[in-house]
Amino acid sequence: MKDIEIAQKSEMLPITEVAQKVGLTADEIEQYGKYKAKISLPLSAREQTKRKLVLVTAINPTPAGEGKSTVTVGLGDAFSLLNKKVMIALREPSLGPVMGMKGGATGGGYSQVVPMEDINLHFTGDMHALTTANNTLAALIDNHIYQGNKLNIDQRRVIWKRVLDINDRALRHVVIGLGGATQGIPREDGFDITVASELMAILCLSKDISDLKKRIGQIVIGYNFDKEPVTVDQLGVTGAITLLLKDACKPNLVQTLAHTPAIVHGGPFANIAHGCNSVLATQTALNLADYTITEAGFGADLGAEKFLDIKTPVLGKTPDTIVIVATARALKMNGGVAKDNLDEENVAAVEQGFANLKKHIQSMKRYNVPVVVAINKFTQDTDAELAKIVELCEQDDTKAIVADVWAKGGEGATELAKAVIESCDNDQEFTRLYNSDDSVEEKINKIVTEIYGGDGVEFSAKAKRQLRQFEKLGWNHLPVCMAKTQYSLSDNAKVLGAPKGFKIHVREFVPKLGAQFLVALTGNILTMPGLPKVPAADGMDVDENGKISGLY
């Protein structure tokens, strides 16, 4: 059966019963129908949990993804089978990849969060609220310029873009304000995808609504004619933008097919944003369950690095164990096998591609966090390929366990769960990659050399000018969010495996003072993706009874 068919045949518990599993009362949730709810914050004081945190990441993926969410869900269900008090914390899917390349993003097979159709489509409206808030701010900026421009905003240097929660390459570069004197001030503009919006990052890094409001006020929307930054606070609309997000900042509660409680909240991409679910979601799970299993987008070079260097300082908690998801097909691709031949057995290519997994293991251990490798089993994998991965990991002094979570759900990950539980009891002191007082160049160089395995960084003339400006403005202390291809450790998507001797090319920076990081745009990475030649939307339908098919 397809994933959507499995989900549609499942019997969900009322969300009130799911909430009770982690001690949430009816007064502490706001129901969105029978099977979804928002968690009301702040929660009342309760007994201290073990507060163990497991971060699930992956190797550099194939275009279809390696099942990181599927493993996260299956692992959570396995913890439940072992009678552990557990919660899963995932990101919300964006309609971009749902309609584009990957289809849905709620796990797969018998390791899914449900109701999957709702979560993948409009869910509780968080994405729409973010899109509206972002575009309201854009409209207020252009209105301010049109109505006299008291702040002397240079319309050539407005950096706040409009957003849309779908891949649409035609909107990357637009000209607005055309049509005459009453239609606004003409200027160049563009659209990003909603999940790349600074408001998404702010939502995911805020500790409470007061912090959300403070961060929104700090957003730099552009520069005046004296080249000084202009903020939302100066524009005077901080309260208006915050109130549009007052419900979106509350974590969403759902369940897995096996009824394990799951929080699905916030959805920044890891290649063009920081790739982690909200601090509020993770903190809520830590307060309610002994074990919180969360994930960070794409490979360990992107989502995990940003989780460790950007999210954990705000969260105030570092992972007790990192699980790296690997697949035979991704190793074969990193070993040089063409995409059309990945289903064929090729143990030699698995061994060749292991260099990619080995680099990610090394990078995560650099933070002094225990690492367990989860080999996500696909139906076409052979015993020889899976055995080779286990063997190579053991030679690298890393525990690796095959997880069959797509076919078996939590039962396919009980051995993995036992290994992770044991690993969580190791009390190791976390080691940070860089310090806040390192220069921006030093921070990026450490990411490139220690996490990517590169030789260094090259900055464009524009990036160098921006670095000088950031130093004058006192922004050097901020962490760096690298915007880079997910398919390679380098900034060239075609260079697979574990390349050496390369440099990362930073073409420009985007300061995100509300999110409190600087985005470094590398290579040809885009903040508004395009749809593929045959988008996933082509196979989707809904019948006369409202039953959805083809979602994935």
Curated annotation (Swiss-Prot):
Pathway: One-carbon metabolism; tetrahydrofolate interconversion. Disulfide bonds: none annotated. It is an enzyme of class 6 (ligase). The keyword Glycoprotein does not apply. SUPFAM superfamilies: P-loop containing nucleoside triphosphate hydrolases (SSF52540). One of its GO terms (biological process) is tetrahydrofolate interconversion. It catalyses: (6S)-5,6,7,8-tetrahydrofolate + formate + ATP = (6R)-10-formyltetrahydrofolate + ADP + phosphate. This is Formate--tetrahydrofolate ligase. It comes from Ligilactobacillus salivarius (strain UCC118) (Lactobacillus salivarius). The gene is fhs.
